Amino acid sequence: MRAIETTVPLPLDEAAAVVRAALAENGFGVLTEIDVAATLKAKLDVDRPALKILGACNPGFAHQALQLDPNAALLLPCNVVLEPAPDGGTRVSAVDPRALMPEPEFAELAESAAAKLTAALDTASHGTTGS
């Protein structure tokens, strides 16, 4: 799956705070946070490495997408995944909106959303935000 990816030079919990701030600077709010490792431990008693999913939404982009096609709700919110990076720090990835919305009527919107997600992850990759 085509993704926008970066590494944040911080442990996962600290990286999550930096990613949240970087998303906010780029117009995204975090609507949900799922601790996948904790959920799987609680429900299935299995251990796995840390994995968090932030459900991020840019209201303007969401509104535009829904105006173009109500089924765009199936793609909301945008998942931003955080997991320990093999070489240290935290790997952060999001599905590239251009891959999710290949239809011509979504091209401009998908490009704008990808640019904002890329900017957010680029900011987060420095381990700090502009705030």
Please state what every model-predicted region is.
Residues 1-26, 126, 131:
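Terminal, regulation- and interaction-focused segments at domain boundaries
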Residues 21-25, 71, 119:
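Short, intrinsically disordered, mixed-charge
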Residues 25, 42-43, 123:
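Residues at alpha-helix termini
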Residues 29-31, 35-81:
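Compact, glycine-rich, soluble single-domain proteins
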Residues 79-103:
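Beta-strand/loop substructures that line and gate deep hydrophobic ligand-binding cavities in soluble
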Residues 97, 101-131:
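Well-ordered alpha/beta subsegment
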